Curated annotation (Swiss-Prot):
Protein name: Glucose-6-phosphate isomerase
Active site: E353 (proton donor), H384, K513
Role description: Catalyzes the reversible isomerization of glucose-6-phosphate to fructose-6-phosphate.
Subcellular location field: Cytoplasm
Source organism: Brucella canis (strain ATCC 23365 / NCTC 10854 / RM-666)
């Protein structure tokens, strides 16, 4: 069926009425009255548990949300994506990052062409190159083994590899991995300064080989290599992830060190492609394939499971409920796993660049809010930074906890138990809160004077009823990481279909790029600032004055 705008509008109205009149108000009471609440509002896929029972929903909420998914034709749009249809309508492209991890022998067609052999060919080339670097068969220009990899990229060419490489640290048995993204010269200077060009491989990740930040940093790195080892050494110390073979050749990188990908892979969905080359070099091709396999398992589940048993669908529906119906403008991603410390930033790009839109697929203004602000930090660090606001602030911010049942350090299992206890405690505290009477009783138990009890007790009250959901898996290994990322990718897709927007373009980044190009000669003093707004003129003048001071 097609998207039913009339039914969709009616269901949204019913959801808003339900939120105002009959959604759970007291979560303590909801759990007390319903011992089966956890069982009804949780799902498992193998060892991965998704619990949303602490969110303010009931059976009526879930029935209406499923009705919403049907009206938005989530299933039809999902089928269109997997079939290679051009669902990215503003760029007239297919959206097939799922093909990058499809290990089946079936066809995946884009405009009548089966892309799976192409995917396999690139993956095999990546594996051969990674094995060569890791084993020392592929050496630097002076014959030394490569000990360090520097990936130069930005956005999707950086955030995914950074996040995955850090997450899979226990599996590193290859060269050390470093990442440069910012145009700020401090980033590349600090990264290269402790390294030796003779044992360093630099990967330049830019599909067009024109991205200004990436290519500026790449030229700096090229000079670093050439000045030390000579111009002829450049080819042995660089590789590229790009489709612009002419530009790569002009840079001095041999074609056998160039790895391509396709326009049906968006940057923020590209860690599964050749963009993941630094990850593969760090952890090895076998572990990288396990990473792909985990994502593929989630793809199959998302494609085949019925709506009410489908983890990405339910995660997306809860996300929509919080954003569009409850009016929560933000969501916090809190992984209780230090190695997932870059996951919030990765999901921030995935979600906000995808669903931060204000027009529908047909170019009309949206009728309600779209994607939320996504942010976060790992636990327990966040508890000592911003959790105060999450518990007692005036804004309600849903939290999404992620924790593993087992850590990688058996001799530190007691610390992992403390980590898990903190995660569950925060989830429970947000839901239960603490009443004024409970605060008084706690203070009275300390034998404080009555006047002091009355003065302090209001400050120790927690409203509770603050929603959170929890994801638990066995252990953060390559398979689990791939599955987790794919879960969030498909969640973003589900929310976008209900919002009625295109999750796969990013026109919002263009205007700033254009103006930066215009302003570069102004900032450098080659052109004047006349014709620009008064604020920009004033800022330029101040910068010029301070640079001369």
């Amino acid at each position: 069926m097609a998207r039913d705008a009339t039914k969709l509008e009616a269901t949204v109205a019913k959801l808003k009425k339900h939120w105002a009149e009959s959604a759970p108000r007291d979560m303590r009471a909801a759990f007390s009255a319903d011992p089966g609440r956890f069982g009804r509002y949780s799902l498992c896929l193998d060892d991965l548990l998704f619990d949303w029972s602490k969110c303010r929903v009931n059976d009526e909420t879930m029935a209406l949300l499923k009705e919403l998914a049907v009206a938005a034709d989530v299933e039809g749009r999902r089928a269109a994506m997997f079939a290679g249809e051009h669902i990215n309508n503003t760029e007239d492209r297919a959206v097939l990052h799922v093909a990058l991890r499809d290990t089946s022998s079936k066809e995946v067609l884009v405009d009548g062409h089966n892309v799976l052999p192409d995917v396999k060919h690139v993956l095999d080339r990546m594996a051969a190159f990674a094995d060569g670097i890791r084993s020392g068969a592929l050496k630097g220009a002076t014959g030394r083994k490569i000990t360090d990899i520097v990936n130069i990229g930005i956005g999707g060419s950086d955030l995914g590899p950074v996040m995955a490489t850090l997450a899979l640290a226990p599996y590193h048995d290859g060269p050390r991995a470093h990442f440069v993204s910012n145009i700020d010269g401090a980033h590349i200077a600090d990264t290269l300064s402790p390294l030796d060009p003779a044992s360093t491989l630099i990967i330049v990740a830019s599909k067009t080989f024109t991205t200004i930040e990436t290519m500026t940093n790449a030229q700096t790195a090229r000079k670093w290599v050439a000045d030390t080892l000579g111009e002829a050494a450049v080819g042995a110390h660089f590789a590229a992830v790009s489709t612009a073979l002419d530009k790569v050749a002009a840079f001095g990188i041999p074609e056998d060190r160039v790895f391509g990908f396709w326009d049906w892979v968006g940057g923020r969905y590209s860690v599964w492609s050749a963009i993941g080359l630094p990850v593969m070099i760090a952890v090895g091709p076998d572990n990288f394939r396990k990473f792909l396999a985990g994502a593929h398992a989630m793809d199959v589940h998302f494609r085949d499971a019925p709506l009410e048993k489908n983890l990405p669908v339910m995660l997306g529906l809860i996300g929509y409920w919080h954003r569009a119906i409850c009016g929560y403008g933000s969501r916090a991603i809190i992984p209780y796993d230090q190695r997932l410390s870059r996951l919030p930033a990765y999901l921030q790009q995935l979600d906000m660049e995808s669903n931060g839109k204000s027009v529908t697929l047909d170019g009309k203004p949206v009728s309600g809010p779209t994607g939320p602000v996504v942010w976060g930090e790992p636990g327990t660090n966040g508890q000592h930074a911003f959790f105060q606001l999450l518990h007692q602030g005036t804004d309600t911010i849903p939290l999404e906890f992620i924790v593993a049942a087992k850590g990688h350090e058996p001799t530190l299992d007691h610390q992992h138990e403390m980590l898990m206890a903190n995660c569950l405690a925060q989830s429970e505290a947000l839901m239960k809160g603490r009443t004024l009477d409970e605060a008084r009783a706690q203070l009275q138990a300390k034998n404080l004077p009555a006047s002091q009890v009355e003065r302090i007790a209001p400050h120790r009250v927690f409203s509770g009823n603050r929603p959170s959901l929890t994801l638990i898996h066995d252990m953060l290994d390559p398979y689990a990481l791939g599955r987790l990322i794919a879960l969030y990718e498909h969640r973003v897709f589900v929310e976008a279909q209900i919002f009625g927007i295109n999750a796969f373009d990013q026109w919002g980044v263009e205007l700033g790029k254009e103006l930066a190009t215009e302003l570069l000669p102004v900032v450098s003093g080659k052109e004047g600032a006349s014709g620009r707004d008064a604020s920009t003129q004033g800022l330029v003048a101040h910068l010029h004055a301070r640079r001369k001071a």
